[in-house]
């Protein structure tokens, strides 16, 4: 099963927008979200991903089929440090979960951007917490720290490591 991680072009912005609907739906179990009058989730604008040099949008494909996305920031959401890498959003379609796709994609992202990393999960998202703890522990061979935040910056665990 070939897994590709490719930087999304501006022409592929609609694919990202469409996938984000599924992502927000998945998160609706743990985040209070509501549908707009048109029956879709209200989404942020993704235009900045093609104009801000510190934002990096990626599409995930499995066997050539769109299977998810990763939005990477070169800026800490917690401190604003522009030397820290941050996975802003990470999504793999359910069909491809528990088949190594997420782990392979996360590893490729980490290997593509060297330096300090922060990975955040929402406190109520037990599946994401378990996934990221496992991926990061394997990737770093256990050399990472985890902090549990519960303030205006974030509510949930944050793993930090250097690669």
Name each region found by the language model:
Residues 75-87, 97, 115:
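A conserved beta-turn-beta hairpin within the catalytic core of GNAT-like acetyltransferases
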Residues 92, 98-111:
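Conserved acetyl-CoA-binding loop-helix of GNAT-fold acetyltransferases
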Residues 3-18, 27:
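A short beta-loop-alpha structural element at the N-terminal edge
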């Amino acid at each position: 099963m070939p897994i590709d991680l490719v930087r999304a072009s501006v022409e592929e912005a609609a694919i990202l927008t469409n996938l984000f609907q599924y992502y927000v739906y998945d998160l609706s179990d743990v985040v209070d979200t509501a549908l707009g009058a048109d029956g879709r989730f209200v989404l942020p604008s993704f235009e900045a991903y093609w104009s801000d040099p510190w934002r990096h949008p990626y599409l995930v494909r499995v066997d050539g089929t769109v299977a998810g996305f990763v939005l990477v920031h070169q800026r800490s959401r917690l401190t604003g440090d522009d030397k820290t890498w941050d996975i802003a959003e990470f999504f793999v379609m359910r069909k491809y979960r528990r088949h190594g796709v997420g782990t392979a994609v996360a590893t490729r992202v980490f290997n593509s951007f060297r330096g300090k990393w922060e990975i955040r999960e929402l406190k109520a998202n037990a599946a994401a917490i378990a996934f990221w703890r496992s991926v990061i522990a394997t990737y770093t061979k256990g050399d990472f720290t985890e902090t549990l935040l519960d303030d205006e910056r974030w509510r949930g665990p944050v793993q930090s490591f250097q690669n």
